[in-house]
Amino acid sequence: MKLGIINGWDEASFRYVAELGLHAVEFCCNHNYDSMEVAGHTDEIKAFGERYGVAVGSIGRWGQKRIDEQGEIIPSALRHDQNLIDAASALGCPVYNVGCNWTEGKTFEENCEIAIRYFGTLIDYAKGKNVRIAVYNCSWENFVVTEKEWTPILGALPDLGLKYDTSHCLGRGGDYLREMVAWGSRIYHFHIKGSLYVDGRHYDDPPAGLDQINWGTVMTVLYNSHYNGMLSIEPHSNHWMGTRGQWGVEYTIKFITPLIMPEDYTYNGSPYMP
């Protein structure tokens, strides 16, 4: 596994990530950005990565409405996703994260079929580009967020994976460890985002390690699921900005790093067990 962080795609962002001692960055080219801001500058972005030793580990587009009121694919939304899949391919980025919005007036089964059609279109487009498609478990213009939706949709699309974030499951009152154990083999990308609930209410998303997520157990499930992708730090709190926010990012790096087995770690044999 490789620890990285969400950040921008300009040179200053790559420099910042490298100064943190990290070697991977995630781009969130959300609905409020034109996809060509990334897709139109891949040569430049690739040069930044080589200069600072930082790989692009994930690209995603959150908040994009992809399906219209009739349940049809919105062509411009599809084009944005295709542009970013092309960008991921050009940058050597292994995963692209998407969602699919709910269509009012359609049944659950019909919405699942719409999502299968949309995700299937992206999977077909990504073939031969070394990019895998993952659906995020955030509900921002996306209804494919729990096992109820994953069972029919991922069941129909064996190449579709998950971008998993424990905080979203916690926010829905779910059991993130149960979800991870059941679906760990389908996790293509993973967010490191702290979350804290008090008396059943959301209190804050503090830096990971200063929150209530059991990160050691989370890592055990990822290891047992043979996950070997990016662990992407997501700062996500207005209480943790400025100097304290930066300290929080650095704290999370120091907290998570010892949980990651080094890539060059070797041992001849196996620990004794009676």
Listing of model-derived features with the role each one plays in the protein:
Residues 1-3, 7-23, 77, 92, ...:
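Histidine-acidic metal/acid-base catalytic patches
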Residues 19, 50-51, 67-161, 171, ...:
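Active-site acidic/histidine proton-transfer and metal-coordination neighborhood
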Residues 1-10, 31-32, 38-45, 76-80:
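N-terminal-biased segments
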Residues 41-52, 117-126, 179, 217-222:
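Catalytic-core regions built around general acid/base machinery
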Residues 26-49, 100-107:
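Glycine-rich, proline-tolerant flexible connector loops at the mouths of alpha/beta enzymes
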Residues 1-2, 57-68, 102:
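N-terminal small/glycine-rich loop or linker at the start of catalytic domains
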Residues 9-11, 29-31, 62-65, 100-104, ...:
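Active-site-proximal loop/turn and secondary-structure-junction residues that shape catalytic pockets
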Residues 27, 57-60, 93-100, 133-136, ...:
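Short beta-strand segments at enzyme active-site cores
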